[in-house]
Amino acid sequence: MFSETARQIVHMSMSVFALLLRVLTWWQAALCAAAALVFNAVVLPRAGGRAIIRPADASRGYPVGILIYPVSVLLLILAFPERLDIAASAWGILALGDGAATLAGRRWGRHRLAWNPDKSVEGLLAFITAGGAAAVFFAWWTAPAITPPPATTFIIAAPILAAVAAGLVETIPIALDDNISVPATAAAVLWLCSLVTAGAWAGNAEAIAANVGPALVVNTAAATAGWLLRTVRVSGMLAGWAIGVVVFASLGVQGWGLLFLTFLTATVTSRLGLKKKALLGIAEERGGRRGGGNAFANTGLAAIAAAAAVATPFREAALVAFVAALATGGGDTAASEIGKAWGGKTYLPTTAAEVRPGTPGAVSLEGSAAGILGALAIAACGALAGLIPPWMVWAVVAGAIAGSIVESALAATLEPARVVNNDVLNFINTATGAIVAIAIVRIS
């Protein structure tokens, strides 16, 4: 008989094998993960493992989560062969954080999360506590095997930050398996933290200190005005304030101005043709007022890039990512909203079939043109502000187009099945735009 408690205990106990990452080479560890995948697929169902296989998986004929777990571990090892401490920490968050959240949520979860009633505050806190502790331990345990050894601040701070980020991602109401989203998020945060250097911080400390005061004042005023003007909800006000402070403190008024332009683009285009959108049932919720999830999905990566520009030695790449993320997000919003308001025929990029406006992933000629022009305008403003050289504008626009294509394809295929939601798609969109823009700049 299936037992969720037994499943989670096994899920958590598998983290003991992460201890081996201190003594194994990356290829030895990869072989072990591959062997675990074969074991879970072939041996486990025949060796009494049905007690930890959910009924839905049993009826399907294969245990999805139990197979994805070793695949995620294998990918972590392959992604960070020289930094197995990152793989071990992310593994600890996957095993202990995710497992503790389920057990605590089932046992003590009484306070539901506002954005996902299926998750609880107690479960989230258990995730962060257990996952953070496990990640710090594994980072410390594997540190002697890393050359050069990571700094103590990284061993302590980065895993905790990764646990918080992964815990929040785990609460997003989507069908994407936690065994994918949790380790991917944790590993991304740990990798970004590994790029931070004391030298970069020291070189920008004076400018950051000078920007903090104005950042607090300007963003408090802007966030309050946005809420009073009913352009954002309370969650959007708070998230926008935090993102704005990070961007202003890191990049000054030039970076913040570009962020504000992106927000203005989203606000204005959301209100264009609002009556028509409402009649068709495709208007943004609450009259286009942006929430916290929308704010982070569209501009969160830009805030991360802004911080990376002053905390890592990769300032140029970070600035390209910053401008590209905003241009991609702003252009995508313009494409979506103008397409729904004034677009003609709309088509799915995956099948070329004509569909009604507002269908996930659907594109129109008018919307696509508006998106490209919006991305071009934001990229050009980024160049005028001195954030990127003018010749990089085309790379940013190309990245924005690539992001839009990827988002449309994923929206048409994965969003209807709730594997991802609109906020996740928007974040993927901005990430794709930033990555493609950086790649183009590097090979140009």
Map each language-model feature to its residues.
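Hydrophobic alpha-helical transmembrane segments
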Residues: 1-115, 124-335, 339-444
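Short, acidic/turn-prone active-site loops that include or flank metal/cofactor-
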Residues: 118
